[in-house]
Structures are given as C-alpha cells and as structure tokens.
Swiss-Prot record:
Keywords assigned: Chloroplast, Electron transport, Heme, Iron, Membrane, Metal-binding, Photosynthesis, Plastid, Thylakoid, Transmembrane, Transmembrane helix, Transport
Cofactor dependence: heme b; heme c
Binding site for heme b 2: 86, 191
Protein name stated in the entry: Cytochrome b6
Any one Gene Ontology cellular component term annotated for this protein: chloroplast thylakoid membrane
CDD domains xref list: Cytochrome_b_N
Length: 219
C-alpha cells in the first residue's frame, strides 16, 4: 500500500491537495444553519445511489412501468427499503433546499462577489424541482399519469404571450400530440441522464466558487 501511495503522491501530489482542503479557514460566525447545503448534497448522493439501484429493475415503458415498480417494492430483496429511502430523501432534499436558500438570502450571501454562486444555486434548485416532476410520473400509475398531463399542459399558457411558443414546448415535452410512450421515455431520460449530468456540472461549479470566495460574512 505504501508503494501505491508513494507512486500516486509523486504524480498527483495528493497530500498537498488534502492539506489545502483541511486547512481552509472557517469563519467563527458559521453555525448549524450553514450546514443545509451539505445536507442537500448528501440527499442528492442518496438519491443517485438508490435511483441507480432501481434502474436495474425499472422498465421505462407505459405498459410495464407500474408492474416493474411493484416488482421492485414486493419482490426484489430490500427493494421496498431502497424505494422508500429514495422517496423520503427526495422530499427531505426539497425541504432542506428551501431552508438553504432562505438562509443564504437572509444572510445576504447572494451579494457581490457571490452573484454567480447564487445564480448556479438557483439553477440547481430548478433542477431539483425538475427531478421531482419527472420522477413523480415514472411509476405511470393514475397519479403519475395525471401529474404528467398537468405538467406537460402547463406551458400552453405561454401561447397567451407568445403565440405558438407554448405549443412547441408541449410538443417537445410530450413527444407528440398526447401523453404516451414518448412522454415516459423523455421523462425517464431527463430524470436519469440529462438532469444528473447538468446537476453534477453545476455542483462542481457551485463548490469551486464557494471554495474560491469563501463563506459569506455575518450581516
């Protein structure tokens, strides 16, 4: 093990990176309310792990989606636990995210020079809500189906301001003239591929800016 560590250290300088991370100054005013962002990240990691586990059994089509979710819950070993953790941590993630945004806003953490940190955080919040919207419909039961109908019909309101623009958005979301298999495929791809990639990129940007600028001071 020592040989492997020395080999990696010579090429990557891991110790200097670790020293830089561990020696970062933490302001004295930081308290438990500054931990909400870390809790959101923890929830995201749990979501990713449990979500990946369920993709091994989930079938993203309108005929077998509900039966595959039922199979995960009732037949797969600890499947009920994995799904319960996924659902519970998703709700907790949204709740703690609201607390995190409130804390940053109330302590003026969005002001100069941290505007870009705030903007990336807002986009991350939008991604979080999008995770919820797309994931809610994946079981393709009655609740998921009608939730999907409501969500995909909402952009039609844009037609009142920009004629035909809302219709274009609806067509992109639905994948046709009505909610069906193309819709489920789009929601599944967004939930398991597009949104995770965008979120990871934004998280990296968010944390690098926090690392560079430090934690905002007290009011």
């Amino acid at each position: 093990m020592g040989f492997i560590y020395d080999w990696c250290e010579e090429r990557l300088e891991l110790q200097s990176i670790a020293d830089d991370i561990l020696s970062k100054f933490v302001p004295s005013h930081v308290n438990i309310f500054y931990c909400f962002g870390g809790i959101v990240l923890t929830c995201f990691i749990i979501q990713a792990a449990t979500g990946f586990a369920m993709t091994l059994y989930y079938r993203p089509n309108v005929v077998e989606a509900l039966s595959s979710v039922t199979y995960i819950t009732n037949e797969v070993s600890f499947g009920w636990l994995v799904r319960s953790i996924h659902r519970t941590s998703s709700g907790l993630m949204v709740l703690v995210l609201l607390l995190h945004v409130s804390r940053v806003y109330l302590t003026a953490g969005f002001k100069k020079p941290r505007e870009l940190t705030w903007i990336s955080g807002v986009i991350l919040a939008i991604c979080t809500v999008s995770f919820g919207v797309t994931g809610y419909s994946l079981p393709w039961d009655q609740v998921g189906y009608w939730a999907c109908k409501i969500v995909t019909a909402t952009p039609e309101a844009l037609n009142n301001v920009f004629p035909s623009l809302g219709t274009v958005f609806v067509t992109l979301l639905v994948g046709g003239t009505s909610v069906g298999q193309p819709t489920x495929t789009r929601f599944y791809q967004a939930h398991t591929f597009i949104l995770p990639l965008v979120t990871l990129a934004l998280l990296l940007t968010h944390f690098l800016m926090i690392r560079k600028q430090g934690i905002s001071g007290p009011l």
